[in-house]
Amino acid sequence: MENNHSVVDQVNKYMSYIYLILFVGITMWYYLYSTVLEYKYPYALYLGLRYALMAYVLVSIALVVWQKQYSTVLEPVFMVLILVSAGVVTYVVKDYGVFDFALLLVGAKNVPWKRIAYVYLCIAVVIQGVAYYAATTGIIADITLQADRGIRHSLGINYPTDMAAHVLFIMLVYAALREKKLTFVEITMMGVVSYWVYGKTLARNDFICAMVMCLLLLVVKVLGLCNIQLSKYKALKAGSILMLVAVVGCVMAVTFYDPANAVYQKLDAVFSNRISLSYQGLAQYGITAFGSVVEENQAVLG
C-alpha cells in the first residue's frame, strides 16, 4: 500500500512540473501579446504548448478518476463541463483564450497553488518591468489616449486600462502569497503604487478595486493583531459567492438601466460609462447562451 502511495505521489509530482512548464509557455504568450514589445513569440511554439496542455488535461482527468482524487463524484464531471462549455464558447466567438484558460484551470488540479502563483508573479514582474523600461526610454511606443480627465499612458502595454489591470493582479497575487506575513508598510506601498498607476493611466475601475483591496487587507491585518481570525466565522463563508453576486448585479444593472434616472447616471459615471455602453450592446445584440460575434466600426469582438 505504501509503495502504491509513493508511486502516486511521484506521478503527481512530475505531473505538476509538466503543468508548470506549460503554464510558463502559455502565460508568456498572452502576457507578451498584451505589450507593445516587438518580440515575436513563435506561433508554432504556442500551438505546440496548447496541444500539449490538452493532452496533459486529458491524462490529468484520467488520473483523478483512476486514483479517486476528488472530494465528490461531481468534481470530475464539473471539470469536463468546464472544458465543454469553454470549447463551445471558443467555437462560437473564436476567442481561443477562453478555452486556454479553461485548460489551465482544470489542469491545475493537484498542483500547489503557491507554485502557480510564484511562477505567474515572476513572469508578470519581469515582462511588466521590461515593457515599462522600454516605453519610458523610447525603445517602444508609449501608447497614449486623450481623455476628459487628461492624457492616459499605457507604459508599454497595449491599453491604459490593461496596464492598470496587470499591476492590480500582480499586487493581488503578491498579497495572497504573503498571507499573514504581509506588513502595513507593504499594504501602504501597494496603495501608493495604485495611486501612481491611476495618475498615469486614469483607469478608474482598477484604481477603485486596488483601493478596496488595500482597505480589506488593512482590516484583516488589524483584526489579526487583535487575535480575531475571520476564518472562524462561518457567516463570512458567504463571501465566497460575492463574485457571483457581482456578476448577477451587473447583469441586472444593465438590464434595468434607465438613462433618465439620476442614480443610474451617477453609477454609470463612476464606472466610466460601462453600464450605458453595456445597455446599448444589450439592446442591439442581445445575449446568447454561448456568446456571439459583434461587429462595430469594422472591429470584430467575441
Where are these regions (language model features)?
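Short, intrinsically disordered terminal tails adjacent to the first/last structured region
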Residues: 1-5
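Hydrophobic transmembrane helix bundles of membrane-integrated enzymes that assemble
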Residues: 7-31, 47-262, 283
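Juxtamembrane/transmembrane-helix boundary motifs at the membrane-water interface
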Residues: 30-49, 299-301
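Conserved phosphate-coordination/catalytic loops
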Residues: 272
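TM-adjacent membrane-interface loops and short helices in multi-pass inner/ER membrane proteins
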Residues: 276-302
